[in-house]
Amino acid sequence: MGAYRADDDYDYLFKLVLIGDSGVGKSNLLSRFTRNEFSIESKSTIGVEFATRSVHVDEKIIKAQLWDTAGQERYRAITSAYYRGAVGALLVYDITRHITFENVERWLKELRDHTDANVVIMLVGNKADLRHLRAVPTEEARSFSERENMFFMETSALDATNVEQAFTHVLTQIYRVMSRKALDGTGDPMSLPKGQTIDIGNKDDVTAVKSSGCCSG
């Protein structure tokens, strides 16, 4: 195992938000990715929690600042601050509860109302280990994600299936959009100080990256 770099030693800082109904497993996805932990007794998040983890992309260190909030309506007052500066999002539903998938459309609208048009979004069908209880067909979710220009994966925070891949794919896509902008001369991400909000460009930038294809459960 290589030596750890200092926590503040990174090339880019990206803010990602986790959104979706209460009980879909957002907090466990966060803890699985950042600490490799899963809690059966996981309780609803009160207010906002955030954690960080750094990953390597093309020999750069990307530090992800991951924000998680409760899905219950009574916490909606934090909306604006929660979304501010986000360049990526995991929109999570529970494959065993169709209502959580139906509500994805509302969460997506809220996300797009409060973020830049180019935010990189991964639709995540969590609890994929509970195949015998599936209520949301994979194809239904995949079709929706394609219509809405999102990436898509099914995950299990319990057994860690696709958790790493979902987060790192979003981070990689954000980085590639930025890198293309720098090469095109339309932006210079290298000049951004650490922690500054990153503008990932116009809609075409993200669409071009997404057209290369992605993921499935």
UniProtKB/Swiss-Prot annotation:
Under the heading CDD domains, the entry gives: Rab11_like (cd01868)
Pfam families associated with the record: Ras (PF00071)
Which subcellular locations apply to this protein?
Cell membrane
The answer to keyword Phosphoprotein applying to this record is no
Question: Which residue numbers carry lipidation of type S-geranylgeranyl cysteine?
Answer: 214-215
Q: Where is this motif: Effector region?
A: 42-50
State a GO cellular component annotated for this protein.
cytosol
Keyword Ribonucleoprotein, does the record have it? no
Q: Which UniProt keywords apply?
A: Cell membrane, GTP-binding, Lipoprotein, Membrane, Nucleotide-binding, Prenylation, Protein transport, Transport
Check the record and name the InterPro entries matching this protein: P-loop_NTPase, Rab_GTPases_membrane_traffic, Small_GTP-bd, Small_GTPase
Q: Indicate how the chain sits in the lipid bilayer.
A: Lipid-anchor
GO MF, one annotated term? GTP binding
Q: Which residues bind GTP?
A: 20-27, 68-72, 126-129, 156-157
The entry sums up its family as follows: Belongs to the small GTPase superfamily. Rab family.
Entry function: Intracellular vesicle trafficking and protein transport.
* UniProt cross-references to NCBIfam families, sorted A to Z: small_GTP (TIGR00231)
> Any idea what this protein is called?
Ras-related protein RABA1e
Please name the gene that encodes this protein.
RABA1E
